[in-house]
């Protein structure tokens, strides 16, 4: 008979499987979990506590997790439970049983119990891991896969709207999606569009004013302004404005010049998450600039001396002390420290991938390989999610630089919905996180995808 082992800081006990099953039968009795409000009490400080078993051994978000042992007390203020170091909500306790809820995105890991006795917590750790089961799916949100808008874009319901080349994408706190449908020139080739409540709407077309070559889109800190880099090209763009802005009070249909630098080739704008400062790249110089107000700007750093035309994408981490610089055409990601108090950057260092080396490989730091990584976003845990454009997939990079596959089949293009590791993308260009889903501008498929990985 197979035994189940659970360890605590003070004890290590071996329980036959029959005892586990008997315990579970006992747990099923409703009366066992009933606690009179008047009998709430902490674990007894002068008695030893035990954490014997937990059940079930696997599950997803919302799974009812039961811990059994001795001297837990009944006051949940003295009890803390974690799954893979993520806090689980403790619902109730009856001194021998704790009832908790598995948190979202816990991943596989040990169950830990903390009991407060006096001023300190006693810690108990399970011998076996709880196996987390993710709920995952990739679906098409809007656009008609494989069908591009040839001339004028078609607005309308999600299932009927036609996109040309969804290029950059962002969501506001209400879940409304704003995206740039790529195009250059003055004759409606590019556009700023909006998707909400099941409908796609075009807000601004390319014109003979300042909005001629939209190449990105990002919100101001309070989400009342959209900043749009205007990419200069010698043939069909006749304005020197390299950053355009549009305001919510005008329903984002107005476009005005924010910064004018001739032939800058700006690809990206980043907004500092604490100060609201606006930063942008100068592709012709391989540099990052800061907007200082009233159309003024200052040069902050050069990513790699003597090198330019990287087609940068910029994004701060959640605390604003690190700027990620995606060198798309050089197949790598840099990071650089930023001091918001002094408005100064450190020295850029290679974070993931290797400069000028394309390919596909998971791994840590410079051991990973990309093929045109593009516009990223952060997930709720602060990981970098990034479309690996010419590898036709989405990658995940932890703050420590560990690179793994997030969704898609590496180096296999196409359009397939379903499980993340079975789904196919075609040159995904940009991502943004909204609620519990990753929104993907699937450029080559002329549509926007929804990736739910709990």
Name each model feature, range by range.
Residues 116, 182-184, 229-233, 274, ...:
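Short loop/turn segments immediately following the C-termini of beta-strands
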Residues 176-179, 225-229, 277-281, 322-325, ...:
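Conserved beta-propeller blade signature
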Residues 244-250, 336-344, 452-454:
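Short loop/turn segments immediately following beta-strands, especially the blade-tip
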